[in-house]
Amino acid sequence: MNTEILKVDRDNLGGVSMAHAGEIIRSGGLVAFPTETVYGLGGDALNPKSSKKIYEAKGRPSDNPLIVHIADIDAIRKIAILDESCYEIKDIEGTVNRLAEAFWPGPLTIILKKTDAVPYETTGGLDTVAIRMPSDKIAAVFIRESCGYVAAPSANISGRPSPTKVSHVIEDLSGRVDMIIDGGDVDIGLESTIVDLTEDRPYILRPGAVTEQMLRAVIPDVTVDKGLKKDSDAAPKAPGMKYRHYAPKGELTIVTGDIDRVIDYINDRAQVCKADLIKCGVICPDEHILRYKAPVVKCTGRLGDEEAVAKRLYSVLREFDAEGVEVIYSESFDSDGIGSAVMNRLIKAAGHKIVQV
């Protein structure tokens, strides 16, 4: 397949190029496009054949649900049931409206019960649908030029770090999709927060830039789902819950504890790697770069700046891949605010390999 790369001007999105991208979606093709979180791999959410193509292009398990992206709040009614009798949560429509008013367009995905308009191929066989309205201007125009309902997981090979730059998308999906829209680097760098409204209370299934504290200000009874814990047997209802995600090619380990002991431990391991002719890398904040003796040290931003870490994390993991790093050690990061999402992704990327020193 010949993949077209479309470079767009954010200040002039009304031309024929975006209309062409939309036509690809309407005709059953696939287009990778930027959002404020990560790049997405888009197809017609209401066309089961398009959803199957997404799974095939990514090498993604077909029971891993896709998020349906919309550009207008009224679009929910076609794809989600809002009848209060179908939910345990009281005033479901009011809850959705409060969340939408507070966080849409933006990095929040809401799970509701699906209508028959949404094929099971899009929902991973579930009776629920995950819905998001992205804030990125290119994404909004693209969705409107398409069918209005764009199913899109991250635009990468399944299991790899999510793409935050168009070069990441080209590396993974060139030759696998019809078009890649080049919108530059993304703003946030981590996938959206996911909130499930189909149970007895709102549950956070995936942390993101919309934090637990921010959600509590709007829906006070929200809580974190037990499926976020490593040993949970809960069935996955959202992307990122079941399979290994975000992983570099090298073996990643997180090291926690007193920072001096952490640095000493990692430096000791780096020496072992050197003796064994294994290329070793380290992830750390800017302030610690000179304290490490590994051949490759990547910084994610200043101490306490978890937003910078979020924006850099996936790029750093891909840089290690490009440099052939075989073993990676990472410091842990503050879990407050978006730091919770950073640690969620880092732990998954490490396959839950954590060393306490």
Model-flagged regions — what are they?
Residues 1-357:
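Active-site-adjacent structural elements in enzyme catalytic cores
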